[in-house]
A protein has these predicted regions:
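Stable alpha-helical elements in mature extracytoplasmic
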Residues: 25, 29, 45, 49, ...
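Flexible, glycine/charged-enriched surface loops at secondary-structure junctions
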Residues: 198-205, 275, 315-324
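Extended amphipathic alpha-helical segments enriched in small hydrophobics
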Residues: 291-319
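Short, flexible turn/loop "capping" segments at secondary-structure junctions
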Residues: 4-7, 29, 62-66, 137-141, ...
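His/Glu-rich zincin catalytic helix
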Residues: 1-56, 72-75, 85-87, 158-263, ...
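A structural supersecondary motif
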Residues: 228-232, 252-293
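Acidic/histidine-enriched segments that form metal/cofactor-coordinating
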Residues: 49-160, 181, 307, 323-345
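C-terminal regions of mature proteins
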Residues: 130, 171-174, 323-401
């Protein structure tokens, strides 16, 4: 997508090789694979590849999310061809040498050890285990399972690259100072020989919580408790997703524009932070409220959050609150559209999940069209107050309510 007045181009290359497409029962393979891909190619080692990138004054990173592995970066428009060649070299012909796996394994295990001491990470993992059954791709954080990381073999890494990193289902988005025709030619030159693999495919059973589930995990030497309260959300392709985004904003997404955020943090001072997110991916990602609180305030913060949720479910939503939530979402969208990276991200989401070529233009109107009745219906259907998962991590936690 061409954006006038710029000298740079933002690039996003998404491949359906994230958590959702990992080998069953092997959480962590996707992340190990992408990290190993950055450790050199069949043409040059990691240092030489990095030097070539630096010579262009460009940036690049490769991350694994719940749905995709995403190569993201930026270069000057004049260097786009050379930049795409470097990206293709890493994606299509990584060396994936045994020593590369050992390097990323060591770093990943060190990160896992650090996360064991981090109350946010501990609470998030505990919540996932409460919510998702064994074998579900979202039961584990993207960093993976410690045993899988320790035992992963280079053959698994190469197999995941072969089976998951391929052009089928992959999307390249370029936004910024570019001529569309020329950009297509450069992309074709860089990736035209990329082949192999079959379209990714995986299905998981719907996740439904049958009761309230609660777990408290003691993390030594901590003074703050972190809370994750949530439910399995909606797949991004669900036609109700935009309504759910508005409901999320009304509920707790933001301390300025959301009820729980305002009351729990600003009015009552029960939390250091409060926010909620709804994950947009191929399956039911987390719809979760996250809070950091003084351990003495854990039960009250949870109770007040449920009180605000019950008000929403009962239809006690002020017109101003709904308008503020819609304005906040549209405002975030407009801010994103001011940068090439933001535009690229929106186009990428639309392409990955089949939201339509007019998604960027239609999305603000869809947000504005969400009514109070829509929010109540979403909260009633997807945020039951008697069926949820609640995880707390920190010092000794008071008994459950």
């Amino acid at each position: 997508m061409a954006i006038p007045g710029l000298r740079s181009v933002s690039a996003l290359l998404a491949m359906e090789a994230g958590q959702f497409f990992e080998p069953a029962g092997r959480p962590g393979i996707a992340r190990l694979t992408t990290q190993a891909m950055l450790r050199g190619t069949t043409k040059r080692d990691a240092r030489a590849w990095s030097d070539a990138l630096d010579a262009l004054g460009a940036s690049a990173r490769l991350d694994v999310g719940s749905h995709a592995a995403v190569f993201s970066g930026q270069s000057l428009a004049d260097d786009l061809g050379a930049y795409l060649d470097l990206v293709a070299e890493t994606v299509v012909t990584p060396a994936l040498a045994p020593e590369s796996l050992e390097f990323v394994r060591a770093h990943t295990l060190a990160e896992i050890e650090e996360q064991k001491k981090d109350t946010r990470s501990v609470a998030d993992q505990a919540w996932r285990e409460l919510t998702y059954p064994p074998g579900h791709p979202f039961r584990t954080r993207s960093i993976g399972d410690e045993e899988v990381v320790r035992g992963a073999a280079i053959g698994e890494i190469r197999a995941h690259h072969r089976d998951g990193i391929h052009p089928h289902g992959s999307v390249l988005v370029l936004a910024g100072a570019l001529d569309p025709g020329r950009a297509f030619e450069l992309a074709e030159r860089a990736f035209g020989s990329w082949s192999g693999g079959d379209p990714a495919g995986r299905t998981v059973a719907p996740v439904v919580l049958d009761a309230a589930r609660r777990r408290a995990v003691v993390v030594p030497d901590k003074t703050q408790a972190d809370i994750v309260l949530g439910w399995p959300g909606l797949p991004r392709r669900d036609p109700r997703f935009t309504k759910a985004q508005v409901a999320n904003m009304v509920f707790a997404a933001d301390t300025f524009a959301s009820r729980a955020g305002q009351v729990v943090r600003d009015e009552l001072g029960l939390a250091y932070y409060v926010f909620s997110t709804i994950s947009g991916t191929a399956a039911q990602g987390p719809w979760a409220v996250r809070m950091g609180v003084n351990p003495e305030n854990v039960e009250r913060a949870i109770a007040v959050t449920f009180t605000e949720l019950k008000k929403i479910r009962d239809g006690a939503i002020a017109d101003d609150d709904l308008a503020l939530a819609r304005d906040k979402l549209v405002g975030e969208l407009e801010v994103g559209r001011e940068s090439p990276g933001g535009v690229a991200g929106m186009v990428l989401e639309a392409e990955l999940f089949g939201l339509g070529d007019d998604h960027l233009d239609r999305y603000p109107r869809d947000i504005r069209a969400v009514t109070k009745a829509d929010v109540v219906a979403i909260a009633s259907a997807l945020l039951p107050i008697d069926r949820y998962a609640l995880a707390i991590a920190g010092p000794e936690i008071p008994p459950g309510r």
